[in-house]
Amino acid sequence: MSPQTETKASVGFKAGVKDYKLTYYTPEYQPQDTDILAAFRVTPQPGVPSEEAGAAVAAESSTGTWTTVWTDGLTSSDRYKGRCYHIDPVPGEDNQYICYVAYPLDLFEEGSVTNMFTSIVGNVFGFKALRALRLEDLRIPIAYIKTFQGPPHGIQVERDKLNKYGRPLLGCTIKPKLGLSAKNYGRAVYECLRGGLDFTKDDENVNSQPFMRWRDRFLFCAEALYKAQAETGEIKGHYFNATAGTCEEMIKRAVFARELGAPIVMHDYLTGGFTANTSLAHYCRDNGLLLHIHRAMHAVIDRQKNHGMHFRVLAKALRLSGGDHIHAGTVVGKLEGERDITLGFVDLLRDDHTEIDSSRGIYFTQSWVSTPGVLPVASGGIHVWHMPALTEIFGDDSVLQFGGGTLGHPWGNAPGAVANRVALEACVQARNEGRDLAREGATIIRERSKWSPELAAACEVWKEIKFEFPAVDVLDKKKN
């Protein structure tokens, strides 16, 4: 008998294929404080039991493969395997389940969202035994959170840098998103900031195209920024998009923004990737830059209810990887986002601790210990009539960003900015006086428009604009 054969025999190796549930379905398991916990929405193929489907997810996203291998005997499966420890049927669905999986912390590299996602949302999402699979939520243990830097600065440090308190911050994405020359782009930035906005923003599509190279844009926008600051006496910012084709080029652009004295840069964190984003977040903390995050490509991942990954998971991943702002939908604008679900992940971004709350789609209690919070950004199809609802929904610790709702003003960019600033201050004052923004919002805007011709003009041009379509991703409810 060869030594190799003896080794196989000594560990009781038996070739073949066995059901995943024999090893990876463990309903008696009690999750540990150090485990990463995942809630998967699993839709098995017809004839596949829920226990087998949940166990398959646990196996294929941790130590398992399709057949027994003799090298299993060279390690401790019980120490490293993922475990499906609980299964709940989804209300109103005949063949859909929420499967809870616990992963030992040793499966993941410290401080790496990239490695965490490679395992948990890797090849298992193409597994043939499943018709569809969606990651609904993660519980990140404190022991793992402490291996990440997190946001470069956080909410309080940003407010101190800007010297702005007691209200949401106001922003604007420069439009048209593509095609402007750097000089005309800088002009629009100046007009918006001069009119009263706190920030202007590069569109996520704007990197360094032939019509406007990044260095030219940075120079003209910096000039606009300083001119507006000098004339208003307020600290202003422009989100310089540092996203690039390589990490080296991305850092070079961030360095140039810092040399210009810019307070903030921007990154498209999903198209750019988590490794690039974490690298940029570390640079921003070391060099005093705020980091604005755009979520371009998120709907490819999170919009379908049965397959992919919910945005609350992407939001948690961003808080680990690092960002001071992130786009989070609007509830009332042109982009997808149900109110309760949106408020659920907004709290996950900002708060130190969130409890399980099925009414908002939160599957796990999550503690962030000392990790700084992230400002949610409401952006996409919003205008002055939305200001009361946005102020009431998102509160002070947010950025309200009006692109077309600023540059689409009939009198020009600066009057559009004035209209938004006046509307915001009216809503904040009314709220502080105890008025109900949800019920009295339209009245509050009309009252203030009597004293602001810019606001009155904006109210007139957008009075009929609504985006009333049903949300695709909604909370689970029993069918009647």
Curated annotation (Swiss-Prot):
User: Which EC class heads this enzyme's classification?
Assistant: lyase
The record ties this protein, via Pfam families, to: RuBisCO_large, RuBisCO_large_N
Q: Which UniProt keywords apply?
A: Acetylation, Calvin cycle, Carbon dioxide fixation, Chloroplast, Disulfide bond, Lyase, Magnesium, Metal-binding, Methylation, Monooxygenase, Oxidoreductase, Photorespiration, Photosynthesis, Plastid
| Compartments it resides in | Plastid, Chloroplast
Residue ranges of the TM segments: none
Q: How, per the record, is the cofactor bound? A: Binds 1 Mg(2+) ion per subunit.
Q: Give the residues the record marks as binding Mg(2+).
A: K201, D203, E204
Q: Does the keyword Plastid apply?
A: yes
Please name the InterPro entries in this protein's record.
RuBisCO, RuBisCo_large_chain_AS, RuBisCO_lsu_C, RuBisCO_lsu_C_sf, RuBisCO_lsu_fd_N, RuBisCO_lsu_N_sf, RuBisCO_lsuI
Q: Which residues form the propeptide?
A: 1-2
Please list the reactions this protein catalyses. 2 (2R)-3-phosphoglycerate + 2 H(+) = D-ribulose 1,5-bisphosphate + CO2 + H2O; D-ribulose 1,5-bisphosphate + O2 = 2-phosphoglycolate + (2R)-3-phosphoglycerate + 2 H(+)
| Residues recorded as bearing N-acetylproline in the entry | P3
Q: Tell me yes or no: is Acetylation among this UniProt entry's keywords.
A: yes
One GO term describing the cellular component: chloroplast
Where is it mostly found?
Answer: plastid
- Cite the EC number: 4.1.1.39
Under Gene Ontology molecular function, one entry of this record is: monooxygenase activity
Outline what the protein does.
Answer: RuBisCO catalyzes two reactions: the carboxylation of D-ribulose 1,5-bisphosphate, the primary event in carbon dioxide fixation, as well as the oxidative fragmentation of the pentose substrate in the photorespiration process. Both reactions occur simultaneously and in competition at the same active site.
PANTHER family, per the entry: RIBULOSE BISPHOSPHATE CARBOXYLASE (PTHR42704), RIBULOSE BISPHOSPHATE CARBOXYLASE LARGE CHAIN (PTHR42704:SF15)
Name the family.
Answer: Belongs to the RuBisCO large chain family. Type I subfamily.
Q: What name does the UniProt record give this protein? A: Ribulose bisphosphate carboxylase large chain
Q: Tell me what organism the protein belongs to.
A: Mirabilis jalapa (Garden four-o'clock)
